[in-house]
Amino acid sequence: MKKVAVIGTGVIGNGWITRFLANGCEVVAHDPAPGAKERTIQAIENAWESVEQLGLKEGASKDSLTFVDSIEEAVKDADLIQESVPERYELKHGVLKEIDRFAHSNTIIGSSTSGIKPTDLQIGLNHPERLVVAHPFNPVYLLPLVEIVGGEATTKEITNRASVYYESLQMKPMVIEKEIEGFVADRLMEALWREALHLVNDGIATTEEVDKAITYGAGLRWAQMGPFMTFHLAGGNAGMRHMLEQFGPALKLPWTKLEAPELTDELKERVIQGCETHANDRSVEELEKKRNEFLVKLIDLVEDYWP
């Protein structure tokens, strides 16, 4: 991948541009908004020290960016196209149809949408099979996760190609096999966000207290492992199996405003087997040791940067 087109240069688009440049790509950008080019140049300048600390790839340069006046000019020779216009369906769909019209038929188009299903974005495209969701996380130039989601017209070959593309950008692509609004990470964050709003609205906690609960509690663990492995370790030597036996009934308690799914035997086994596979033959004791080493370093960082 040598040449990348970025359509839309807001916060997300500029984050993509910075990541592409830091990985040695030539970037062609288009955004009709007044002052877009100047804002992009400033955004790159602000982020460059951070990407330098992560490590630049050979050929990385802030100067490998060109702004053009049309979508046609931006996408005509691109190896990858990243659409990052505002999150309005009519706008995104219209822009994607124009991209599809002018881009080479085998060029992958990645949409940065945070919630629209790719099948809905593929409607009316001449080559709908090459459009995938490639949803990043802010700041795009630092956070490695990118969710890749295909629509009904997308082939496995396309999602595999997209995954390879984004992995070459020092990212951690996660291919989501079944499309759903909001995908995976944002749905998890949305659940926490809604509960946080309930706690504040009901006068139970202030916004600062909610943030403190995450910053000095679960957030530290989540920086290394997600909820399933966190609870796997909480189950002691028996792991998730013991965790579900002991605490599974608590899902029926009215602790959140969200209704929990029925904890069926099938769901239990799926969760248990998933955690045991993820543990990769490492004992809970081994995992705890690694977690603790990580947390000691992370807590020091939190104290240094977030007093």
Swiss-Prot record:
Pathway: Amine and polyamine metabolism; carnitine metabolism. InterPro entries: 3-OHacyl-CoA_DH_NAD-bd, 3HC_DH_C, 6-PGluconate_DH-like_C_sf, 6PGD_dom2, L-carnitine_dehydrogenase, NAD(P)-bd_dom_sf. It holds the Pfam family 3HCDH_N. It catalyses: carnitine + NAD(+) = 3-dehydrocarnitine + NADH + H(+). One of its GO terms (biological process) is fatty acid metabolic process. Its EC number is 1.1.1.108. Catalyzes the NAD(+)-dependent oxidation of L-carnitine to 3-dehydrocarnitine. HAMAP family: L_carnitine_dehydrog (MF_02129). Belongs to the 3-hydroxyacyl-CoA dehydrogenase family. L-carnitine dehydrogenase subfamily. This is L-carnitine dehydrogenase.
